Amino acid sequence: MALERSDVEKIAHLARLGLSEADLPRTTETLNNILGLIDQMQAVDTSGVEPLAHPLEATQRLRPDAVTETDHRDAYQTIAPAVEEGLYLVPKVIES
């Protein structure tokens, strides 16, 4: 599956990316190369291969789940333009 220029323009619009006319050919080629690599990986027969969660058989040493830092939320929120009930208020960017 190869992407056309119009596909890349639509993807850029949906992702809110500003691509210049000069960037479109290079971006289209890069995305097509990525999709080609994905096609190659999907073509490999892995029917006899067990799923692998991690390449190394190692045990993770996890630290205890304990609070190690003090709460600085109030100090950080004093410089925020708008805060309500401990949450930062930001302008709406996605229209419904």
UniProtKB/Swiss-Prot annotation:
It catalyses: L-glutamyl-tRNA(Gln) + L-glutamine + ATP + H2O = L-glutaminyl-tRNA(Gln) + L-glutamate + ADP + phosphate + H(+); L-aspartyl-tRNA(Asn) + L-glutamine + ATP + H2O = L-asparaginyl-tRNA(Asn) + L-glutamate + ADP + phosphate + 2 H(+). GO terms for molecular function: asparaginyl-tRNA synthase (glutamine-hydrolyzing) activity; ATP binding; glutaminyl-tRNA synthase (glutamine-hydrolyzing) activity. GO terms for biological process: glutaminyl-tRNAGln biosynthesis via transamidation; regulation of translational fidelity; translation. Coiled coil: none annotated. It comes from the Bacteria. Keywords: ATP-binding, Ligase, Nucleotide-binding, Protein biosynthesis. InterPro entries: Asp/Glu-ADT_sf_sub_c (IPR036113), GatC (IPR003837). Its EC number is 6.3.5.-. It holds the Pfam family GatC. It is an enzyme of class 6 (ligase). SUPFAM superfamilies: Glu-tRNAGln amidotransferase C subunit (SSF141000). NCBIfam families: gatC. Allows the formation of correctly charged Asn-tRNA(Asn) or Gln-tRNA(Gln) through the transamidation of misacylated Asp-tRNA(Asn) or Glu-tRNA(Gln) in organisms which lack either or both of asparaginyl-tRNA or glutaminyl-tRNA synthetases. The reaction takes place in the presence of glutamine and ATP through an activated phospho-Asp-tRNA(Asn) or phospho-Glu-tRNA(Gln). PANTHER family: GLUTAMYL-TRNA(GLN) AMIDOTRANSFERASE SUBUNIT C, MITOCHONDRIAL (PTHR15004:SF0). Belongs to the GatC family. Heterotrimer of A, B and C subunits. This is Glutamyl-tRNA(Gln) amidotransferase subunit C. It comes from Pseudomonas aeruginosa (strain ATCC 15692 / DSM 22644 / CIP 104116 / JCM 14847 / LMG 12228 / 1C / PRS 101 / PAO1). The gene is gatC.
